[in-house]
């Protein structure tokens, strides 16, 4: 499942969302996937449990978090959601706080999780200007167009 197709088919983009805590921000992304029948509601708790155990493991770049759990933690099918925050939040990551872009990922198997999802997101942000371009997006279509332009350039 491609990042762009998943976001479009699942209607799983939320821009300029308001959250007061990192937990609320993660829940927004998971709730989009629950609504699209990609994950079960328990996926949210699995992500929180992962942070409790390993720290903010999914904050992968300055301003960018990629919340995800394991396939057996409530994943029904592979999919993504994308959330931008109106106000950046602290995720307690030493180097990459504050975060205002979250791409929540669910994958039915670990290989899909690592290879497909992470590579597509790396591709999107290889051009660092895309962080600010994404922050400037105000509609889901603008996000999809940005991904299309990035893929065309790759």
Curated annotation (Swiss-Prot):
One of its GO terms (biological process) is phosphoenolpyruvate-dependent sugar phosphotransferase system. The phosphoenolpyruvate-dependent sugar phosphotransferase system (sugar PTS), a major carbohydrate active transport system, catalyzes the phosphorylation of incoming sugar substrates concomitantly with their translocation across the cell membrane. The enzyme II UlaABC PTS system is involved in ascorbate transport. GO terms for cellular component: cytoplasm. The modification Phosphohistidine is found at residue 68. The lineage of its organism: Bacteria, Pseudomonadati, Pseudomonadota, Gammaproteobacteria, Enterobacterales. The gene is ulaC. The PTS EIIA type-2 domain is phosphorylated by phospho-HPr on a histidyl residue. Then, it transfers the phosphoryl group to the PTS EIIB type-2 domain. Residues 6-150 form the PTS EIIA type-2 domain. It comes from Salmonella paratyphi A (strain ATCC 9150 / SARB42). It is found in: Cytoplasm. Keywords: Cytoplasm, Kinase, Phosphoprotein, Phosphotransferase system, Transferase, Transport. The active site is at 68 (tele-phosphohistidine intermediate). It comes from the Bacteria. CDD domains: PTS_IIA_fru (cd00211). This is Ascorbate-specific PTS system EIIA component. One of its GO terms (molecular function) is kinase activity. Induction: Induced by L-ascorbate. Repressed by UlaR.
